[in-house]
Amino acid sequence: MNAITLVHSGHVPVMLHEVLEALSPRAGGRYLDGTFGGGGYARAILNAADCTLDAIDRDPAAIERGNAMAVQANGRLRMHQGTFGDMEALAGAEGPFDGIVLDLGVSSFQIDQAERGFSFRNDGPLDMRMGSDGPSAADLVNTCKEAELADILYRYGEEKLSRRIARAIVAARAEAPITTTGQLAHIIRCCVPRDRANIDPATRSFQGLRIAVNDELGELERALEAAPRLLAPGGIFVVVTFHSLEDRLAKRAMAVLAGRTGNPSRYEPAPLRQEAPAFSLLYSRPLSATDEESRENPRARSARLRALVCNPAPKMPVSGMPS
């Protein structure tokens, strides 16, 4: 098994040690990376064991990086272009999988490239699309009604001053279209005070627009529904989230699958038989990045890792024998 070394030097995968510990790649295993990005998880999984890996990404640049890595992997890596919400259609035929991992949010490649339009620190075209299809952030900012903009910023960015920001955006675009990240960031900064934590006032609004442009929560909901069906018995599903909206969805979906939906009402009749859940939580609480990793990689500070295990089917008693 040749070690795979082709990973862009600027990419730092978050909570890599914890992801590998949860997945525990084994020889002959089959794994799925739903968010290839810079290939950090993919490389680590393939180097950890003589296994096979299917990887998904909607970004053509990520697919190009993955295809280059696949040459080194000698047939152990297969790339699929598309969204991880469509993992069943894209890679389901290659399963069932012994492990599936999702690293949500924007990759460092996308943030660092001003021309992708994700960053409010570097001026570039107001795009924010992880792929190449669909409306851009500029389309939303320049065409949505004020109430729609406010709703996007509030729901997806959790921005309390969403109405004020939406009003300022509509006033600014009446003078001239908003086409760059620098323009938008300036508009937001002019009407939102910097908070005590010294977080840039544009942070939440940019998050809200990015989530809306890429339908990130819809993709996650579809993935949370599909991934459990693709797991082999004993398989592990790992999700790394970066903000509370993602984490709440992952927490709720995994709790339901693991039968952790709370105690039934005392007024409801008790079920005749309690079925063993098909899944279990690998950790009772989400894991966070270590202090050392958070210092070295600020993006890791908000990361939370949750994991689900597909329980082996219970053995059925032999007919005629006592159970």
From Swiss-Prot:
It holds the Pfam family Methyltransf_5. One of its GO terms (molecular function) is rRNA (cytosine-N4-)-methyltransferase activity. The keyword Lipid metabolism does not apply. Keywords: Cytoplasm, Methyltransferase, rRNA processing, S-adenosyl-L-methionine, Transferase. SUPFAM superfamilies: Putative methyltransferase TM0872, insert domain (SSF81799), S-adenosyl-L-methionine-dependent methyltransferases (SSF53335). It catalyses: cytidine(1402) in 16S rRNA + S-adenosyl-L-methionine = N(4)-methylcytidine(1402) in 16S rRNA + S-adenosyl-L-homocysteine + H(+). It is an enzyme of class 2 (transferase). Its EC number is 2.1.1.199. InterPro entries: RsmH, SAM-dep_MeTrfase_MraW_recog, SAM-dependent_MTases_sf. Its main location: cytoplasm. It is found in: Cytoplasm. GO terms for biological process: rRNA base methylation. Coiled coil: none annotated. S-adenosyl-L-methionine binds at residues 39-41, 57, 84, 103, 110. One of its GO terms (cellular component) is cytoplasm. Belongs to the methyltransferase superfamily. RsmH family. Specifically methylates the N4 position of cytidine in position 1402 (C1402) of 16S rRNA. PANTHER family: 12S RRNA N4-METHYLCYTIDINE METHYLTRANSFERASE, S-ADENOSYL-METHYLTRANSFERASE MRAW. This is Ribosomal RNA small subunit methyltransferase H. It comes from Gluconobacter oxydans (strain 621H) (Gluconobacter suboxydans).
